[in-house]
């Protein structure tokens, strides 16, 4: 289980941690899962503006205001609970020879727009095969 600080970042790159986890395995599937109702996991390009573009797009799609029936927590918190409908809580990546088979520009990231929860858990699991 990874413990991730999201207090200052909305997108956190998990790729290095996933690569390190996969080195203990050979061939199979690595699943990256966030057991939270207001966060997700994505495979995107980072460092070229795509991560900021994703956050900007999600903020436009899910504005923090009083339109939501789910109204506990901070103002607009209902939007946070809709995030996993757009960014799933898990991704599965094929692994060969202990290496995740990601494309050149692909990174595995935690997406968390909910500033009420500054710590997240991320579960890594592996299915041999």
From Swiss-Prot:
It comes from the Bacteria. InterPro entries: UPF0047_YjbQ-like, YjbQ-like_sf. It holds the Pfam family UPF0047. Belongs to the UPF0047 family. PANTHER family: UNCHARACTERIZED PROTEIN YJBQ-RELATED, UPF0047 PROTEIN C4A8.02C. This is UPF0047 protein Mb2586c.
